[in-house]
Curated annotation (Swiss-Prot):
Signal peptide: none annotated. InterPro entries: L-lactate/malate_DH, Lactate/malate_DH_C, Lactate/malate_DH_N, Lactate_DH/Glyco_Ohase_4_C, Malate_DH_type3, NAD(P)-bd_dom_sf. NAD(+) binds at residues 8-13, 33, 95, 118-120. Coiled coil: none annotated. This is Malate dehydrogenase. It is an enzyme of class 1 (oxidoreductase). PANTHER family: L-2-HYDROXYCARBOXYLATE DEHYDROGENASE (NAD(P)(+)) (PTHR43128), L-LACTATE DEHYDROGENASE (PTHR43128:SF16). It comes from the Bacteria. Its EC number is 1.1.1.37. Catalyzes the reversible oxidation of malate to oxaloacetate. It catalyses: (S)-malate + NAD(+) = oxaloacetate + NADH + H(+). The gene is mdh. Keywords: NAD, Oxidoreductase, Tricarboxylic acid cycle.
Length: 307
């Protein structure tokens, strides 16, 4: 990919830029931030690691949205973060106002770009960006399930003592406490995780996955998680930039899948050069469908606050 932009040079944005640059994911990587010098400093700091890591990506930063011109993919990490005790929905009103201004700038300077939403609450902001741009759903999507699934796989590895390389986990639904860890679709080298874990251990893993971000926030106190979210973003960007056709849980607009429309939710998608190239509709058992619907209801409630 020729050019990628990251809006927000905070911890998640800067860490994402590090991953993308080290992997030579694009030829040009730009960072945009309203804070004077923040994006420029982050870009320069990462650029100076190029001789050590051996990448050729060129980075630059700025405060003017014109820097987005020519970007094929724009990653939005800007917004106010959660503080201890806050839910992702608690930052909704402020982050929607921020998003609206950002989207207007993107539409002016990078009208052909794809948008990858990261700021919380990501399901609602993805819907808002899609609604405001009027772009097709393949071009507007969000990151949540890749991170949640990575957390779940990590906890399975820690609980079993087995290699994380053999573990595949799947988490669907909204990116919040009502997310839906899909145990039936989570395996260790093709074997269902329930073969290796007791129901008590599974319950612990599910609960820890649902509150993974809050756990880190409570421990750090001064910041949310940023390395794992950035790695999740980088995995999605890699799938798109290199047209890998990967199946990854993605916040996507539903157009009849799962019997739903006019809502953005975490569902398995095929990611490639055109963004969300397909939404995969999994058959759900009654208990899974109940959890999915509960998660969906929470997202719809937040979306309805915007209408």
């Amino acid at each position: 990919m020729e050019k990628i932009a990251i809006i927000g040079a905070g911890r998640v944005g800067e860490s994402t830029a590090q991953f993308l640059a080290k992997n030579d994911t694009c030829r040009e990587l730009v960072l945009l931030d309203v804070r004077e010098g923040a994006a420029e400093g982050a870009a320069l700091d990462i650029q100076e690691t190029a001789p050590l890591f051996g990448f050729d990506t060129r980075l630059k930063g700025g405060t003017d949205a014109a820097i987005l011109s020519g970007a094929e993919l724009v990653v939005i990490t800007a917004g106010i973060p959660r503080k201890p005790g806050m839910s992702r929905s608690d930052v909704l009103d402020t982050n929607v106002a921020i998003l609206d201004k950002l989207v207007d700038g993107i539409m002016e300077h990078a009208p052909d770009a794809m948008l990858l939403l990261v700021s919380n609450p990501v399901d609602v902001l993805t819907y808002r960006a899609w609604q405001r741009t009027g772009w097709p759903r393949n071009r507007v999507f969000g990151q949540a399930g890749v991170l949640d699934s990575s957390r779940m796989a990590s906890f399975v590895a820690l609980e079993t003592g087995l290699s994380v390389n053999d573990i595949n986990a799947m988490v669907l639904g909204g990116h919040g406490d009502s997310m839906v860890p899909m145990l039936r679709y989570s395996t260790i080298n093709g074997i269902p995780v329930r073969h290796f874990l007791s129901e008590e251990a599974i319950a612990r893993i599910v609960e820890r996955t649902r509150h993974g971000g809050a756990e880190i926030l409570a421990l750090k106190q001064t910041s949310s998680a940023y390395d794992a979210p950035a790695a999740a973003i980088a995995a999605m960007v890699d799938a798109i930039a290199l047209d890998r056709k990967r199946v990854l849980p993605t916040v996507a607009l539903l157009e009849g899948e799962y019997g739903e429309r006019d809502v953005a939710m975490g569902v398995p998608c095929i990611l490639g050069r055109n963004g969300v190239e397909s939404v995969i509709e999994l058959p759900l058992e009654p208990s899974e469908r109940k959890e999915f619907d509960q998660s969906l209801a929470g997202v719809r409630d937040d979306i309805n606050r915007l209408k």
